[in-house]
């Protein structure tokens, strides 16, 4: 009943467990009421965590367009930050204070190619609902601003269903 009155919903999944059976039931209900959703994958620092694997499960099991808006830097106990695909920069947390402080840095070289691919997928997905952004994407994708991506993300939220981010 609450779902029919809601403006949106956050679906939390564990990076190790992925999509669980109760998620499928709740997802179908949200589909019925056309509730926009944002996904959140937590426990990225656990053994066996797989952010992109969880996104793939959401696509395969729930039929959603799970669009990552971040990419993890490191896996399991080496999880130390994220690449923000909207801002096109990396955020690395400091271990000594359990991540309450961080540095904003360039995207690590070993993640640049994957970050570029995922950013392209994100922009393509949201550009379906913003013709100006779509044109700009094909003409000069490097000129797309953070604000343009945020605005298109807002417009497309109900259609994409689940922009997805992560944490430990």
Task: Annotate each language-model stretch with its function.
Residues 1-11, 158-168:
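Single conserved hydrophobic/aromatic residue that forms the stacking wall/gate
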Residues 5, 9-13, 17-20, 68, ...:
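P-loop NTPase switch module centered on the Walker A-proximal segment
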Residues 9-24, 31, 35-52:
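Conserved Switch II/interswitch segment of TRAFAC-class P-loop GTPases
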Residues 22-29, 40, 50-61, 81-85, ...:
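Alpha-helical scaffold elements adjacent to nucleotide-binding pockets in ATP/GTP-utilizing enzyme cores
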Residues 47-103, 161:
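Canonical P-loop GTPase G-domain recognition
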Residues 110-157, 161:
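Non-catalytic, charge-rich alpha-helical accessory subdomains
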């Amino acid at each position: 009943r609450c779902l029919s009155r809601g403006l949106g919903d956050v679906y939390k999944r564990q990076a190790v467990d992925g999509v669980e059976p109760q998620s499928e039931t709740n997802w179908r209900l949200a589909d019925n009421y056309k509730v926009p959703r944002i996904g959140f994958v937590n426990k990225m620092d656990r053994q066996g965590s797989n952010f992109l694997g969880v996104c793939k499960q959401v696509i395969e099991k729930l039929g959603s367009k799970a669009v990552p808006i971040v990419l993890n830097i490191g896996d399991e106990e080496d999880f130390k930050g994220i690449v923000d695909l909207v801002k096109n920069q990396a955020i690395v947390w400091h271990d000594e204070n359990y991540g309450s402080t961080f540095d904003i840095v360039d995207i690590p070289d070993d993640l640049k190619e994957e970050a570029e691919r995922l950013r392209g997928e994100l922009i393509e997905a949201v550009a379906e609902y913003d013709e100006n952004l779509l044109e700009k994407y094909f003409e000069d994708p490097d000129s797309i601003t953070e604000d343009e991506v945020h605005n298109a993300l807002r417009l497309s939220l109900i259609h994409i269903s689940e922009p997805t981010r992560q944490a430990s």
